[in-house]
Regions:
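As written
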Residues: 145-146
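Conserved nucleotide-cofactor-binding alpha/beta core module
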Residues: 134-136
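Active-site pocket-lining/capping segments in soluble small-molecule metabolic enzymes
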Residues: 1-130, 150, 157-295, 299-355
């Protein structure tokens, strides 16, 4: 099972691949795009410059370094586009193909069809924004040349396994670290960049300096009174992803599994849900289910955080391959504490069982 790591600068490539990543993915937010459509209408669903390569020159360096390691690199073009945006999107596609990017991560049905018709040999990976919740949707994307599907966060592992079994000749990915939002990517219209617009320096400066991840880490150690203010929305955060939602279990009768799912959804709407969610404990099930790769979220995260994430997963997968681990969950939690310096917060991906 492969490890897919995010990359936002050529200098990260060697470090991440040597740490154990098998594949990288990235996005480009060029000056031409920002000038015409602004950051908020990002071509790859990441509005922050800190999450992106600046231009095609940087992309070329990332591709060259990745290929020098014998690894592969995927370019994200996974937003939904207006007609006037298509020329710049297709220009970036042509530039990426000229640089020999290995695959394009896409979600827009119009773009998927266009790429399949114009570039039938190009590997298309359907983003989680493509909302692939069942085997029929997989068959639909297969008809347009999809080679890989990124499965939504909202699926249970048993559902993933059934979908994979129905299409054994396709590759599938699932998220395992960071950004465990329970909103459905392809349907959600929340704007992640609102706080940056309303409270510019407070949010832009840390991102530009690569310190935003460190600030989020600090939330674990703030007094409970301040943490309550964060949850209540009384600090300058305007992202709808971080409001304090009421989540109700409507299952009748309520079950342990449904209560666990409801709690997991509620816990996911917080600032810490941007950095802490994890599925390390479920790696054995994901591996047994036939998953091609596990994906680390966080193109905007500091390089040190990305590196630590790769080291964490590589160590667990290597241990899993030895068949000598008697209590994998306990080992995963022990490694989490050792590498990250704090205990597992139990913000779990695919938390359909009581812990």
């Amino acid at each position: 099972m492969k490890i897919l790591a995010p990359c936002n600068h050529p200098n990260e490539v060697d470090l991440l691949l040597e740490a154990g990543a098998d594949e990288l993915y990235c996005g480009v937010l060029s000056q031409a795009w920002r000038s015409r459509f602004t950051n908020l209408a990002s071509c790859n669903r990441r509005e922050w410059r800190a999450a992106n390569l600046d231009d095609v020159e940087q992309l070329g360096r990332v591709v060259a370094r990745t290929h020098a390691h014998g690894a592969v690199i995927h370019l994200a073009l996974n937003a939904f586009y207006t007609e006037e945006q298509y020329p710049l999107v297709l220009e970036q596609v042509e530039q990426a193909l000229a640089l020999e990017v290995d695959a394009l991560i896409v979600a827009d049905p119009g773009l998927i069809r266009t790429l399949h018709e114009r570039y039938p040999a190009v590997r298309l990976h359907i983003s989680t924004g493509g909302t692939t919740f069942n085997r029929a949707t997989v068959a639909f994307y297969r008809s347009f040349g999809a080679a890989r599907i990124v499965l939504p966060r909202q699926l249970r592992i048993e559902e993933m396994t059934a979908i994979i079994a129905a299409h054994p000749d396709l590759e599938f990915e699932a998220f395992v670290l960071n950004s465990g939002c329970k909103n459905i990517d392809g349907f959600c219209t929340f704007q992640h960049g609102v706080s940056e617009l309303r409270h510019g320096p407070l949010w832009k400066v840390p991102k530009r300096l690569g310190l935003d991840g460190l600030l989020l880490d600090g939330l674990r150690y703030v007094p409970k009174s301040l943490a309550r203010k964060v949850r209540a929305g009384r600090l300058p955060m305007d992202s709808a992803c971080h409001l304090s939602y009421q989540v109700t279990d409507l299952t009748q009768p309520s079950t342990k599994q449904s209560r666990c799912l409801a709690k997991n959804v509620k816990d996911s709407f917080s600032l810490l849900a941007a950095v802490d969610p994890c599925a390390a404990c479920r790696l054995p099930e994901l591996l047994a289910g036939g998953l091609h790769g596990v994906k680390i979220v966080g193109r905007n995260h500091p390089t040190a955080k990305k590196h630590r994430d790769v080291v964490f997963l590589r160590g667990l997968l290597d241990a899993l391959s030895t068949d000598m681990v008697t209590d994998f969950r306990a080992m995963a939690r022990q490694e989490f504490r050792r590498l990250y310096g704090y205990a597992c917060a139990e913000l779990c991906y695919y938390s359909d069982e009581a812990k």
